[in-house]
Amino acid sequence: MKSGIYQIKNTLNNKVYVGSAKDFEKRWKRHFKDLEKGCHSSIKLQRSFNKHGNVFECSILEEIPYEKDLIIERENFWIKELNSKINGYNIADATFGDTCSTHPLKEEIIKKRSETVKAKMLKLGPDGRKALYSKPGSKNGRWNPETHKFCKCGVRIQTSAYTCSKCRNRSGENNSFFNHKHSDITKSKISEKMKGKKPSNIKKISCDGVIFDCAADAARHFKISSGLVTYRVKSDKWNWFYINA
C-alpha cells in the first residue's frame, strides 16, 4: 500500500487535479466512482468529466508517509507548483481529506450520498442488512464472553449481579423494607389506589386442573389462607403448581 501525493490529468487539455491518499489505488477508484455518480467533491473536475468523458489518467507525484502535517504541506506545494487551483481542478487548498466542506454544491452532494445509502439499505431489506452488517457474539471484534452473564431464567444481567431483578430473593433481610411498617394512613392510601388492580408479579396457579389468576383467588375459592396455597404448591403431595413460573 503506497501513500502520498498524486495527480489526475486531463489528457486533452493537460489540466490536473492534485490530491493525497493513504492508498493510491483505492483513492483513484473512489474518484471515478464519484465522478460517474455525479457527486465528486471538485465541481470543476466533475464538469470536465461530464463534458469530456473519461479522458483522465492518474499518476503519483510523490510517495511520502501518510502524516497529516507532511501531507498538507506537500499537497499544497504541488497545487501551487502545477497551478491546479487557477488553471486546474482543485477548488481549495489541502485539507487532509475534507474537500466537501468547501464545495459549492455541498448540500446536493450530501443529499445524493444519503439517497444512495438509503436506496442500498432498502434494497437489502432487514435480512440482507443483518447478514451483511450484523456481527453478533464472537464475530464482533469488541465481544468479550467475560462481560456477558445470564441469569438462570435466561435474562442477561450485569457481571456483578447474581440474578435478574425478577428472580432476586426479596424475603427477610434481603428486602429493603425489612423491619419497617407502613402507617395506617399509608396503608389506607395504598389500599384505595390498588382497588380493582392486580399486582404485576402475580402468577397463575393450577389446583387439580382448575386455573386461578393468583394464589389469593385460589385461597378465596377453597376458603384457606394464601400461605396454605403456597405450601401446597411447594408440596409433592398436592397437584398444585404455578403456570409458566
From Swiss-Prot:
GO biological process, one term: negative regulation of DNA-templated transcription
Signal peptide: none
Cofactor or coenzyme needed: Mg(2+)
GO cellular component: transcription repressor complex
CDD domains for the chain: GIY-YIG_Cterm, GIY-YIG_HE_I-TevI_like
GIY-YIG domain span: 1-88
UniProt KW keywords: Endonuclease, Hydrolase, Intron homing, Magnesium, Nuclease
Stored InterPro entries: GIY-YIG_endonuc (IPR000305), GIY-YIG_endonuc_sf (IPR035901), I-TevI_DNA-bd (IPR048681), Intron_endoG1 (IPR006350), NUMOD3 (IPR003611)
Pfam families cross-referenced by the UniProt entry: GIY-YIG, I-TevI_DNA-bd, I-TevI_ZnF
Classification via SMART domains: GIYc, IENR2
Function text: This endonuclease is specific to the thymidylate synthase (td) gene splice junction and is involved in intron homing.
Protein name (database record): Intron-associated endonuclease 1
Source species: Enterobacteria phage T4
Gene responsible for this protein: ITEVIR
